[in-house]
Structures are given as structure tokens and as C-alpha cells.
């Protein structure tokens, strides 16, 4: 089979598969172009690394890049969930059934050994969740995060946690392995932290007890007030550490306004008249003291915090998935993280009240 025929056969399977995945965050009817295919394991089953470019309807949206780890076998993998199976395509060796390799234990372990050639991993399980990445637990000791949406340049989740680890900040889990190609970060491995849960789960449990028992908050065993105060202190320590690791400058109100207008335009997508909101944003340019501008988490909330032992740990520093990579890495006001966390508390309260 020539390369053009192979690419056409694979592309026909990839478009519907991508659109059905929870981690996929681009156009619902993608135009897929295969940019690279590498074989990480030959034979049956094979392990393929595939880089694809995805464009939106009629090419209007900016292209996005996704990496796929695909398995190929001579028999249909009926034991895997339907959402993990792409279908069959012809090859010189006969029909090959394609599937998400990270859903298959054998191939997921093979890929983990690609990331860490010294690893002797024997067990793997996937973590649930609707993210732009896939997380695998290895031997209940390590966490392998595989980025699905990729782009040229460092991934903030790798860049920030590596930098914070170098200065000794304890509120993040520093990488032990990073798998990259050229200048693109593709996967990161960290030690698995033992936790009591995320801030979101602990806050919801606290509110459920409060609403059901009708006792004063201080009389509830799961009261989250003290934990919330400790979490706030950890966020403050994070910002101090980020300023130390990446530097701090006086915030530019005009630049912050431009950033907010750009984000507003993406959210509104021409469906709302944003003129009055933009006028309010423009007033930032006249502010005399906007505080400091530093690297920030970018999408902070209760679900991005883990309660460990006697402290809190903050995770998932990719930033907002809808923002271009350059914007995610741009310094901003630490109040952006504070606003994200505050909004998260509101969402949790609303969810608990609705139950």
C-alpha cells in the first residue's frame, strides 16, 4: 500500500473517532490531515504515534494539532469499549483493526516504557475525566499524563512545574520524565500523590452534610471553612513561587484589557454585542496601579487542587484550553487565578443546592 492510500484510509477512520472523544475540543465535523506516523512497536499488535492537523468547518477556524497513540491488530479488539475502536483498514499484511492504544493495557504499558525506558511497569489504569489529556496510573506509583491537543513550544503544565520544582516549591508535583519531540511536549510522568480528594469533592461533601443535617457549619465534621483558608494560603504561596521562578513586572492595564477583549471575542463568537463590556475593559488602561504581572495557573479552581497529607497541591497548569498557547504562557494578574477559584466555589454551591 502506498503512503497516499494509507493516509486516505486512516483519515477516513480518524475524523469520526476524533469527534466522539471527550478530550477532543475542536470542530464537530473536523477536516483531518495526517502530518506524521511513527511506529513505536511493530508486529501485532502494533503501536503507532500519529500527529494530525484538524481544521474547522470550511477551514475557517485556526488549525489544531492532536497526537494519537493507536493500536493496530489483526483481530477486532471486542474487549475494548466501542468509543475506543476506530474500525478496520486494509494493509499489506491483511486487515488491521485500529483502536486507542491507551485503552489497551498491553500497549499502554508499552507506551509508558517509551516515555521512561528504565521503567518496569506491570499495571496500568486510566483515570476518568473530561480533559484535553489522558491520565494513566502506573503501578499505583506514577501518573502519566498524555497531552492530546499539542502545539509547538513548551506545555505550561511541564514548564511551570519543572520551574517550581527547581526552586523547591512543594505545592506541585515536579516531573520525573518528560516525553517531547523537537520542541513539543507530548507527555509527562510524575509520582502519584496519595490524596483525600480534590477541593471540589471535599467542598461538595461539606455542603451536603450542612444542608442535610441543618446544623451550624462549625458543628459539621466535614466543614470546609478551615480547609478553604488553607487552600487560599497555598494559592498565595504559589503566586510568590511563580514570581520567584519567572519574575514579576508591573501590570500593564492596557495589555490586560486587550487580553480580556480577545478572550471575550472568542466566547461571544459574534453572537453578542460586546461593545459595552469592551468599553469597561478599556478603563483598565487608565488605572494607576494594577499590581504585579506574573505567570499564573490560568484555569485555577477547586478541581485543580488536591488535599494531600497536611497540605494542598495544585495541578493541571495547561491553562484554558480555548486560549492560544502564546496567551496561556503570557504573564497576567494573580487576581485571575483568585477569580477562577472564587467562581469555582460558586459552582460548587450551586451544584450542592440543586441536589
Predicted regions: what they are:
Residues 47, 54-265, 269, 309-311, ...:
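Conserved ATP-binding subdomain of kinase catalytic cores across diverse folds
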Residues 292, 296, 304-315:
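Conserved protein kinase catalytic/activation segment
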Residues 5, 9, 255, 272-275:
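Alpha-helix boundary/N-cap detector
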Residues 1-34:
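Short Lys/Arg-enriched alpha/beta "domain-start" segment
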Residues 119-123, 261-296:
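An alpha-helical support segment within catalytic cores of ATP-dependent transferases
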Residues 29-43, 49-53, 284:
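Short amphipathic beta-strand and strand-loop transition segments with alternating hydrophobic
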Residues 26-39, 120-128:
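Short secondary-structure junctions
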